[in-house]
């Protein structure tokens, strides 16, 4: 692997799946992976884990006050190798109230404080953690974020454009985002999806907590990863209207 080795957690998750089906691999050093040839996959019973990258939107909703008793998140493995599992610890470090339960977590409202957030192994969390930072007291720094520029959109530039449209104080460099918490927020023109499912969902979270109603053009981008996102949002009591124009 050529350095810098970012998103290592995705490699570890793949290796865990290989082992589950009988294929062995081992690290010789931090950057060298050895996979012996001639191995055969073996059948196995496998349970598909819940996705922490999608859970993150509802974890942030719970931390910022959605749901009268908080938001209960089930169907995930707290010991998962998924890098996006870091969202739980990030919210805790910023002051969030999270109770681990047998099948997941209960996330409850808390006063959030600014944080220093390393996105090297969890870049997909960038958009929704930017929304969390917009509601935290002080200036948050999201760093090792350069991979966000080569996702479905330039997630640094486009998240900045949309959050600033809503009144969020944010600036960025090639690899970092700096966000000063505040609110309430409002946009006086439609927000844009940039054909990016995670930007749509992050903006929906922003709209649901501490923001005037938002119109998000191109919201159908959620079909890529979470077609039922808006239905699940409605189940938490968030008002969602689908515009046909």
Residue spans for each PLM region:
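Short, structured segments at the rim of ligand-binding sites
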Residues: 1-245
């Amino acid at each position: 692997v050529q350095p810098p080795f970012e998103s290592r957690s995705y490699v570890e998750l793949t290796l865990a799946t290989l082992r589950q089906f009988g294929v062995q691999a081992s690290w010789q050093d931090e950057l060298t992976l050895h996979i012996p040839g001639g191995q055969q996959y073996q059948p196995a019973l496998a349970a598909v884990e819940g996705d922490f990258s999608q859970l993150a939107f509802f974890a942030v909703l719970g931390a910022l006050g959605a749901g009268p008793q908080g938001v209960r998140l089930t169907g995930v493995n707290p010991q998962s190798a998924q890098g996006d599992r870091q969202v739980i610890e990030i919210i805790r470090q910023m002051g969030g109230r999270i109770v681990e339960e047998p099948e997941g977590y209960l996330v409850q409202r808390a006063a959030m404080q600014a944080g220093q957030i390393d996105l090297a192994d969890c870049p997909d969390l960038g958009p929704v953690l930017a929304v969390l930072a917009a509601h935290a007291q002080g200036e948050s720094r999201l760093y090792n974020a350069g991979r966000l520029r080569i996702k479905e959109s330039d997630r640094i530039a486009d998240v900045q454009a949309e959050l600033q449209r809503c009144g969020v104080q944010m600036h960025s460099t090639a690899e970092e985002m700096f966000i000063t918490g505040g609110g309430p927020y409002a946009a006086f023109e439609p927000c844009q999806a940039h054909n990016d499912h995670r930007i749509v969902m992050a903006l929906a979270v922003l709209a649901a907590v501490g923001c005037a109603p938002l119109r998000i053009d191109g919201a159908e981008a959620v079909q890529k990863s979470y077609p039922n996102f808006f239905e699940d949002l409605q189940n938490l009591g968030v008002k969602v209207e689908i515009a046909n124009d």
